[in-house]
């Protein structure tokens, strides 16, 4: 298959791109890495009048860390998140999770912003971003800048909170304390496939009792699920050998998941409980090692 005919514009600055979006917002497709858009065009599932290619906008490719916040341009490629030291040293959870995302060919072209805008329920990065408490910075010529939380940005399966004339420009990610343990775990049919279930975990402890927890799951619902109930249950719990088994049992009791064509609700709850307990065990192990270094 080949795409239907469309106009093509490749701006070199953000103001230029926003002006084009303002003029053509009713029938435009934004080309970032193209890993989702190009198949849709080729199968004629998407038939835009205009394709706006944002690959030459340098403002969207920058990464910097200031005041305990990592500022990531929406056009930063997956391979940079996985490999560059600024990510590995400040937010290693992202780099670890990125090893499970797709394959090297896709990671070389795919972008963080494009992945988030695609908002696939089984995608890893939306869950990671949710666990980290990141903010999405959206800009338009008319509205200026809007900053959305993950809960505001991810509206449903393949649905995001962008207005038709807006562009996701930056992701702002709070840098966790160096004493916070972290881990990402998932189960997929093959490495690089979409997750059947994934868990992103951040936990901290003082005197070997958990005093901080942020957990988000993917492939459980239409959007990333922030596991507030488990976070609250973890606070005050001791970090020890019994923690993973206790977490697994408690998850089974409180998880509410829907059945779909790929898995029964019971099996998905079992899978999510196992994946979450495994991630918490690894994050807790990192807390122990950090405590040793701190001591």
From Swiss-Prot:
Catalytic reactions of this protein: caffeine + a ubiquinone + H2O = 1,3,7-trimethylurate + a ubiquinol; ubiquinone-0 + caffeine + H2O = ubiquinol-0 + 1,3,7-trimethylurate; theobromine + a ubiquinone + H2O = 3,7-dimethylurate + a ubiquinol
Enzyme class per UniProt: oxidoreductase
SMART domains per UniProt: CO_deh_flav_C
Keyword Oxidoreductase belongs to the record: yes
Span of domain FAD-binding PCMH-type: 1-178
Any one Gene Ontology molecular-function term assigned to this protein's record: caffeine oxidase activity
Function: Coenzyme Q0 (ubiquinone-0) is the preferred electron acceptor and, to a lesser extent, coenzyme Q2 (ubiquinone-2) can also be used, but oxygen and NAD(P)(+) cannot. Is involved in a caffeine degradation pathway that allows Pseudomonas sp. strain CBB1 to grow on caffeine as the sole carbon and nitrogen source.
Subunit-structure text: Heterotrimer composed of an alpha (CdhA), a beta (CdhB) and a gamma (CdhC) subunit.
Name recorded for this polypeptide: Caffeine dehydrogenase subunit beta
Native source organism of the sequence: Pseudomonas sp. (strain CBB1)
Gene that produces this protein: cdhB
């Amino acid at each position: 298959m080949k795409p239907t005919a469309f106009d093509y514009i490749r701006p070199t600055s953000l103001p230029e791109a926003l002006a084009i979006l303002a003029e053509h917002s009713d029938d435009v497709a934004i080309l970032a890495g193209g890993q989702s858009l190009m198949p849709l065009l080729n199968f004629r599932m998407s038939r835009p009048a205009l394709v706006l290619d944002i690959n030459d906008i340098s403002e969207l490719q920058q990464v910097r860390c200031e005041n305990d916040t990592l500022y990531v341009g929406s056009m930063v490629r997956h391979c940079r998140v996985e490999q560059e030291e600024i990510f590995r040293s400040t937010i290693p959870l992202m780099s670890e999770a990125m090893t499970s995302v797709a394959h090297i060919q896709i990671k070389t072209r795919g972008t963080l912003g494009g992945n988030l805008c695609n908002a696939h329920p089984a995608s890893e990065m939306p869950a990671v971003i949710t666990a980290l408490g990141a903010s999405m910075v959206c800009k338009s010529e008319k509205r200026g800048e809007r900053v959305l939380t993950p809960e505001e940005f991810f509206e449903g399966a393949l649905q995001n909170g962008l207005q038709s004339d807006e562009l996701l420009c930056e992701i702002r990610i709070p840098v966790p304390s160096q004493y916070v343990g972290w881990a990402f775990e998932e189960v997929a049919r093959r490495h690089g496939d979409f997750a059947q279930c994934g868990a992103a975990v951040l936990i901290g402890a003082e005197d070997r009792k958990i005093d901080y927890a942020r957990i988000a799951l993917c492939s459980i619902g239409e959007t990333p699920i922030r596991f507030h109930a488990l976070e609250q249950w973890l606070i005050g719990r001791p970090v020890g050998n019994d923690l993973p088994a206790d977490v697994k049992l408690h998850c089974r009791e409180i998880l509410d998941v829907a059945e779909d064509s790929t898995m029964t609700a019971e099996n998905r709850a079992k899978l999510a409980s196992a994946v979450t307990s495994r991630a918490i065990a690894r994050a807790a192990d990192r807390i122990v090692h950090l405590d040793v270094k701190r001591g």
